[in-house]
UniProtKB/Swiss-Prot annotation:
Pathway: Phenylpropanoid metabolism. This is Monolignol oxidoreductase AtBBE-like 13. Keywords: Cell wall, Disulfide bond, FAD, Flavoprotein, Glycoprotein, NADP, Nucleotide-binding, Oxidoreductase, Secreted, Signal. Belongs to the oxygen-dependent FAD-linked oxidoreductase family. The lineage of its organism: Eukaryota, Viridiplantae, Streptophyta, Embryophyta, Tracheophyta. GO terms for molecular function: cinnamyl-alcohol dehydrogenase activity; coniferyl-alcohol dehydrogenase activity; FAD binding. Its EC number is 1.1.99.-. GO terms for cellular component: extracellular region; plant-type cell wall. It holds the Pfam family FAD_binding_4. The FAD cofactor is bound via a bicovalent 6-S-cysteinyl, 8alpha-N1-histidyl FAD linkage. Its main location: secreted. Glycans are attached at residues 7, 59. Mediates oxidation of p-hydroxylated derivatives of cinnamyl alcohol (i.e. the monolignols p-coumaryl-, coniferyl-, and sinapyl alcohol) to their corresponding aldehydes. The electron acceptor required for these reactions is not known, but does not seem to be dioxygen. Is much less efficient towards cinnamyl alcohol. The keyword Transmembrane helix does not apply.
Length: 534
């Protein structure tokens, strides 16, 4: 059960509030009581404190639901994983300010959650400090679209799908270049970079941010002018949970055509899949900027009734234009795929987003408002950036590795276009010119702890095999595909071990900004930006 905090500045009414909860008098801890009283004392009285507050002690089922609803990686919901003291869901910005002030006063460690998609569960689990609380921003999801200024203010708890839907409500010829997974929380998504199917045309979501509102470690709300250009730079790609609580982003809308074309073409190894993928590597970053073709690679049965497996390569594309122009582009640049008019689906931009995200073709656009993840598994993920085509022999070795595992999945996303034009120091996200494509590595399973060691072991072996074919010095990684194998704060490793992989030459600047903006390191987690380097 969630209990409701009613706004009262009067100490007597605060006492009545706590007494009203005392039907389980020994279960409501001193920490929780102190936090409730502090919240009421530090919130603006004009905004009712009717936020939800979930604690395991008062009602385990409601607490479990609040903890698990948005969590994507089931590995971090096992009974053995640390659980928060409580979960607080603010309804107004002033409640977030109060939560920061009270956590600081009571020396409580905060975990900040907007969408719950952190691959290593860092928005809802803490291994480094087990006495922690979650501030869940999912109720802060207001979206205000202004077509005249080509901009929108979007609060951190809104999902990417909601943002897309609210934009298309106002205009069929405007969009935003962000994520492919529509259940992502926009707060954490943009702060890590935010790539999507229009990145080759318009860059990342973080490249299209005009302003932001953030709560700092002193509980102050700062916009771009107040936080300064250094902090504004840092929060557009520097990773979540390091500089403050993102309340909202002001994003720049981009033009999209009335007709967008999507397609999926699948080839197996028996259909020259290896040769085709080698060719894709040579052209994917050089294609027309209106065209995005990613490759989804996984084992599949050779025939519907066969137990023998092969490798499937699915080329999934989005083109900002009609099918006739797409076919001209493909014939000129990538005829080897053999794309035909029959493969193409002409649709609206919003429907193309849903196609890429995996929604059924019959799903209405209102399905984007649901915000629920279509992907929920036990999994381990890693990432790589590729700067030279992987040779055929390297691909053949990869196929052998993939066929060893039960449910592996790898997704290759093309770069080039606008991504190659933006300097790598423009934001903390450095993976720009020279990158051909990014690889996401995944292994998924359904039976919890019993087979985790097996799947984790396979992932690390495969990752080791691929080292010779990917970026070097550093072997780069994407911060929003969080990977604790790269190193952790407080575990005896130099933060450069993971920081340089995520941010390359931008890491030291991030550390300098962190030291000035949050010198006490209030906002921290296993891979947060440190205040100093060893």
């Amino acid at each position: 059960m969630a209990f409701v905090l009613m706004n009262n500045t009067n100490a007597f009414l605060v006492t009545l509030l706590l007494l009203s909860l005392s039907y389980i008098p020994l279960s409501f801890s001193t920490i929780q009581q102190d936090f409730v009283m502090c919240l009421v004392d530090n919130s603006d009285a004009s905004f009712p404190m009717d936020s939800s507050f979930f604690t395991h002690d008062l009602n385990a089922s409601s607490f479990k639901l609040a903890l698990e609803t948005s969590a994507q990686n089931l590995r971090y919901l096992m009974p053995s994983n640390p659980k928060p003291e409580f979960i607080f869901e603010p309804l107004y910005e002033t409640h977030v300010q109060a939560a920061v002030l009270c956590a600081k006063k009571l020396k409580l460690h905060l975990r900040l959650r907007s969408g719950g998609h952190d691959y290593e569960g860092l928005s809802y689990v803490s291994e480094m400090e087990t006495a922690f609380v979650i501030v869940d921003l999912s109720k802060l999801r207001q979206i205000s679209v202004d077509i005249e200024s080509n901009s929108a203010w979007v609060h951190a708890g809104a999902s990417i799908g909601e943002v897309y839907y609210r934009i298309q409500e106002k205009s069929k010829i405007h969009g935003f270049p962000a994520g492919l997974c529509t259940s992502l929380g926009i707060g954490g998504h943009i702060i890590g970079g935010a790539y999507g199917s229009m990145m080759r045309k318009f860059g990342l979501g973080a490249d299209n941010v005009l302003d932001a509102r953030i709560v700092d470690a002193d509980g102050k709300i700062l916009n771009r002018a107040a936080m300064g250009e250094d902090v504004f730079w840092a929060i557009r790609g520097g990773g979540g949970g390091s500089f403050g609580v993102i309340l909202a982003w002001k994003i720049k809308l981009v033009p999209v055509p009335e007709i967008v074309t999507v397609f999926t073409v699948t080839r197996t190894l028996e259909q020259d899949g290896t040769k085709l993928l080698y060719k894709w590597q040579q052209v994917a970053d050089k294609l027309d900027e209106d065209l995005f073709i990613r490759v989804i690679i996984q084992p599949t049965s050779k025939t519907p009734k066969s137990k023998e497996r092969t490798i499937s390569t699915s080329y999934q594309g989005q083109f900002l234009g009609d099918a006739n122009r797409l076919l001209q582009v493909m014939q000129r640049s990538f005829p080897q795929l053999g794309l035909t008019k029959k493969d193409c689906l002409e649709t609206s931009w919003i429907k193309s987003v849903m196609y890429i995200a995996g929604f059924p073709s019959t799903a209405p656009s209102e399905a984007l408002l649901d915000g629920k993840s279509l992907f929920k598994n036990y999994f381990k993920a890693k990432s790589d950036y590729v700067e030279e085509p992987i040779p055929v022999e390297g691909l053949e070795g990869l196929w052998e590795k993939l066929l060893e595992e039960d449910s592996p999945l790898t997704i290759w996303n093309p770069y080039g276009g606008m991504m190659a034009k933006i300097p790598e120091t423009e934001t903390p996200f450095p993976h720009r010119s020279g990158t051909l494509f990014k690889i996401q590595w995944l292994t998924l399973w359904q039976d919890g702890k019993t087979s985790e060691a097996k799947h984790m072991g396979w992932m690390r072996e495969m990752y080791s095999y691929m080292e010779q074919y990917v970026s070097k010095s550093p072997r780069s990684a994407y911060v929003n595909y969080r990977d604790l194998d790269l190193g952790m704060n407080g575990k005896g490793s130099d933060a450069r071990e993971w920081g340089n992989r995520y941010f390359k030459g931008n890491f030291e600047r991030l550390v300098e900004i962190k030291a000035k903006f949050d010198p006490e390191n209030f906002f921290r987690h296993e891979q947060s930006i440190p205040t100093e380097l060893e």
